């Protein structure tokens, strides 16, 4: 159905540059991050969307996508677009797909397309005919593109086609469209329903180009057209309804049912659903852009994405909650439980504990071998039951995913693995017959 298995991948955004030209990561630095993530995750499939790849950085010059950010190029390349081609090509060595974070909703007066979009009346207008303002992003006032008028006029196809000529997105097979929500235009008589129909046409065109589209949050009308959103706003009923291979989500940054949600900036409460109470019980991944703190990002992989990939191999069957616990039952005899008082998460499969708070012992399911990853935030003495697929293993191999792959001591007795982990460290463990 989709080009990629998003529910079995580490999907994230990397922050390159804010406007005007405030560089955080160059294309070379991004490749180094990708390489290090590959080494620390046993080569998990990565899908990395670049934020701020264009013009002067994130949210600059929309609706134009015609120029790669010169601040990010390698010294040896003549043009920034050559450097981006290089990054997209080299990332494949690390089981990584690199693509773009773009926007089809916003327009700025500084854009080279501004005059054209005003001339052909492609912007959303208020009832009195004035241009409808969007947010102020990076110090610039944004206005809103009428997707319905832009699609009808052919300009949407034109800028998609031009982008596909500029960069090998068809080869990447995925793109992330920021925001991507219906924008009614009162002056033009364009309704939410009109916009939603247009959005489906736009997604259909991307798909005809063999490219998946991911976005920021869910609209129910788009399930089956979008494989994944960065901020998952599904409630419990929808998480039971949709299999993760059809519709999955990243993290919970905009989960409006979290206790701290009342302290966040308003605006996103208008989303179709408010989210669920304890998203970790269902499986959640990362949804904070990677800047340069790779240690924190790696911890999120072990504590979020690794359980996310594991739980997404099963179907959520039922959900229950008491005054003390919040539980989800999955197929495969898998159970998750959150202790409400301290939000302590446990995950079990056939009564075998595989996640205990910030201690994790889970299979690397993207590998053909029977390898497991163990991680601990606090460190200390670990004891985990030998996985049933290991059979009657008498001893194991293990090595650190940090410190250059140093061999780690692991003992096995009475079907229990025992070893010591330093705080915020991970090892890979495999049976001796491998």
Predicted segment positions?
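Beta-sheet entry/capping signal
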Residues: 44-49, 95-99, 173-174, 210-214, ...
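Active-site-proximal substrate-binding groove within the catalytic cores of carbohydrate-active enzymes
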Residues: 4-27, 104-107, 118-173, 179-434
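Aromatic- and glycine-enriched glycan-recognition loops and surfaces
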Residues: 12-119, 196-200
């Amino acid at each position: 159905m989709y080009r990629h298995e998003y529910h079995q991948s580490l999907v994230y955004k990397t922050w390159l540059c804010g406007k005007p030209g405030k560089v955080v990561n160059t294309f070379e630095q991004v490749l180094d991050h990708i390489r290090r993530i590959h080494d620390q995750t046993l080569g998990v499939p990565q899908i990395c969307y670049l934020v701020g790849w264009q013009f002067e950085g994130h949210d600059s010059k929309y609706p134009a996508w015609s120029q790669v950010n010169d601040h990010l190029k390698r010294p040896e390349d003549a043009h920034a677009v050559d450097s981006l081609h290089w990054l997209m090509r080299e990332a494949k060595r690390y089981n990584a797909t690199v693509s773009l974070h773009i926007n089809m909703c916003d327009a700025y007066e500084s854009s080279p397309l501004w005059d054209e979009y005003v001339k052909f009346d492609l912007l959303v207008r208020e009832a009195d005919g004035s241009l409808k303002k969007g947010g102020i992003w990076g110090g610039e006032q944004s206005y809103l593109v009428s997707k319905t008028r832009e699609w009808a006029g052919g300009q949407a196809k034109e800028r998609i086609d031009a982008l596909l000529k500029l960069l090998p997105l068809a080869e990447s097979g995925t793109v992330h469209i920021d925001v991507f929500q219906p924008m009614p235009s009162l002056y033009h008589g364009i309704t939410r329903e009109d916009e939603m129909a247009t959005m489906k046409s736009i997604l259909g065109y991307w798909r005809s180009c063999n490219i998946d589209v991911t976005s920021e949050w869910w609209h129910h009308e788009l399930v089956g057209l979008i494989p994944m959103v960065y901020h998952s706003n599904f409630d419990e009923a929808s998480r039971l309804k949709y299999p993760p291979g059809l519709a999955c989500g990243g993290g919970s940054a905009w989960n409006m049912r979290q206790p701290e949600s009342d302290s966040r900036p308003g605006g996103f409460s208008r989303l179709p659903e408010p989210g669920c109470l304890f998203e970790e019980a269902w499986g959640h991944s990362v949804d904070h852009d990677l800047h340069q703190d790779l240690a924190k990002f790696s911890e999120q992989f072990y504590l979020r994405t690794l359980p996310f990939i594991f739980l997404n191999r099963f179907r959520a069957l039922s959900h229950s909650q008491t005054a003390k616990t919040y539980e989800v039952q999955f197929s495969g005899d898998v159970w998750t439980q959150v202790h409400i008082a301290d939000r302590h998460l446990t995950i079990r499969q056939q009564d075998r504990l595989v996640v205990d708070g910030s201690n994790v012992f889970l299979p690397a399911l993207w590998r053909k071998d029977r390898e497991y990853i163990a991680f601990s935030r606090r460190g200390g003495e670990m004891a985990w039951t030998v996985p049933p697929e290991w059979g009657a293993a008498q001893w194991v191999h293990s090595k650190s995913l940090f410190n250059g792959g140093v061999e780690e001591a692991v003992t096995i007795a009475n079907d229990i693995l025992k070893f010591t982990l330093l705080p915020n460290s991970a090892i890979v463990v495999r049976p001796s017959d491998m």
